[in-house]
């Protein structure tokens, strides 16, 4: 099933047909922030006011059907750290100081997970058998460290999930067209994944372009996840719709990838 765009009360987000719990990859549309954060900025610490971010999170919760007070967020450092969380980790959506990690997993009903992006690759995970969910943020370093696969591993080890049951969605990121790097990035991918990854690397002059969505999908396939939906949106190409760190030279807000755990059968 394809990734689809939805708009509820002016809040625009992308959803995956295979994930049946509340979830979405947000866009810039539907919030109250202004300037470079206009308008649905979800991240603190980027020059926006706390009041704006809180209202944006309220609006997102209303659109997707989750309680913002039961959010758990990430403090992202391009690591491979995956945190297992419960309702005890919900600190309220006004709280800015969460422990360092780049992925979250839970099987606690009504807990909502949120990771932030603005070119990096967002991934969401859902197991309809156990009800467990996950969310991951993968920059090129996280991709090389296989954070998507490690998120799956955390779901398997902590919640008894089977990879073949897990449904995953890969959201908008900076595409092959604009993710230009020096040689260190493809070398990191080759060290992590071997020769198979070369098909997702293009040399253009003295620079390299990489397809990070495809590399992350390959990584998930290797650990047994085959139900993967992939957005074709590039944050750089569509920087009027998504925040792109590169296109905006760092003057930006952040969109989010969000998913809520629900009791199995409800």
Where are these regions (language model features)?
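Active-site microenvironment for binding and transforming phosphate-containing groups
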Residues: 1-266
